């Protein structure tokens, strides 16, 4: 039985950047039987809470977008939390989905799964071909484990569990917490606050040389619903825009758009992160999907 507009669909993490975009895309397409729970309602780190939720709600389809996320500093400062919390969340949800007969699950990973110095653009087959970027290896290891668990359950139990790896995201519902946000929302907040307070200079980490690709969250939501409707394979699939710019260019654009009149200082004593990260999304595009926002 295939996905229908009345199918019972659970979006884990539906208030996050990715999860809320999935929710909007589902609603836009006419899906009307959606389930979303805040962490205070169902703590996905609690095995009994997850079991009770699946037993009572009986979702037919699951988007697993719930995760503990953050930037370089958060990953460096809280490696144990990033590794354990993400492993725990995805293990509980994926296994409960198997045991309760979920028809299809989509696990949402991250582009940080790829080796630090992998060839560019990043193709799916480059997974586990070299050492990870040290600044986010804990999150990456958890996401790799999630991919492999979906593959293992497909092989052993015949579960239709798929995985998608998005590039860097931006959009409504992003996290602007200075301790836990990613590069773009962190910059937006920093330059906005500097403008409001009249600070003459803004300091950014690193050299500004790393290259990054960005995708609007609504494009991601559209892509993930497209995959849930059209893709069924063991191999995970990249989701990107195929456009990149340097962190320095990003900072200059944010500064200009916000109207910040001061200067930008680059603190090269702080880490840059991965030198370049551009996804090869040709497999997804060959299926008939392409970004609308970019």
Task: Please annotate each region the language model reported.
Residues 12, 37, 62-68, 105-111, ...:
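SDR active-site strand-loop-helix element
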Residues 12-13, 17, 21-29, 193-294:
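C-terminal substrate-binding subdomain of Rossmann-fold SDR/epimerase-dehydratase oxidoreductases
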Residues 27-52:
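Adenosine-cofactor binding site in Rossmann-like domains, unifying the SAM/SAH pocket
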Residues 47-87, 96-99:
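NAD(P)H-binding glycine-rich loop region in Rossmannoid oxidoreductase-like domains
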Residues 91-136:
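Conserved Rossmann-fold NAD(P)-dependent oxidoreductase catalytic core, especially the SDR/UDP-sugar
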Residues 104, 109-110, 147-172, 185-188, ...:
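Conserved beta-loop-beta element that borders a ligand/cofactor-binding pocket
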Residues 113-115, 138, 162-186, 210-211:
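Flexible, glycine-rich beta-alpha linker
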Residues 138, 142-145:
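Active-site helix of classical SDR
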């Amino acid at each position: 039985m295939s996905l229908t507009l009345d199918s019972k669909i659970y979006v884990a993490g539906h208030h996050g950047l990715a999860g809320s975009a999935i929710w909007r895309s589902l609603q836009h397409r006419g899906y009307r039987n959606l389930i979303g729970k805040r962490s205070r309602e169902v703590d996905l780190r609690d095995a009994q809470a997850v079991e009770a939720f699946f037993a009572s709600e009986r979702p037919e389809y699951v988007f697993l977008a719930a995760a503990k996320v953050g930037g370089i500093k958060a990953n460096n400062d809280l490696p144990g939390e990033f590794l354990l919390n993400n492993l725990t969340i995805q293990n509980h949800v994926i296994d409960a989905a198997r045991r309760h007969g979920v028809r299809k699950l989509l696990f949402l990973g991250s582009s940080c799964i790829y080796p630090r110095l992998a060839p560019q653009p990043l193709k799916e087959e480059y997974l586990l071909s070299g050492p990870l970027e040290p600044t986010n290896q804990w999150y990456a290891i958890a996401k790799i484990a999630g991919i492999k668990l979906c593959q293992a359950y497909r092989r052993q139990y015949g579960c239709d569990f798929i995985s998608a790896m998005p590039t860097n995201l931006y959009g409504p519902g992003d996290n602007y917490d200075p301790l836990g946000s990613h590069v773009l929302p962190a910059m937006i907040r920093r330059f906005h606050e500097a403008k409001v307070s009249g600070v003459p200079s803004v300091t950014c980490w690193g050299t500004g040389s790393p290259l990054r690709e960005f995708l609007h969250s609504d494009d991601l939501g559209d892509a993930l619903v497209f995959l849930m409707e059209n893709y069924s394979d063991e191999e995970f699939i990249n989701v990107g825009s195929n456009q990149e710019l340097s962190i320095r260019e990003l900072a200059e654009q944010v500064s200009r758009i916000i109207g910040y009149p001061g200067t930008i200082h680059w603190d090269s004593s702080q880490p840059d992160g991965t030198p370049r990260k551009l996804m090869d999304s040709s497999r997804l595009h060959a299926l008939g999907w392409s970004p609308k926002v970019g």
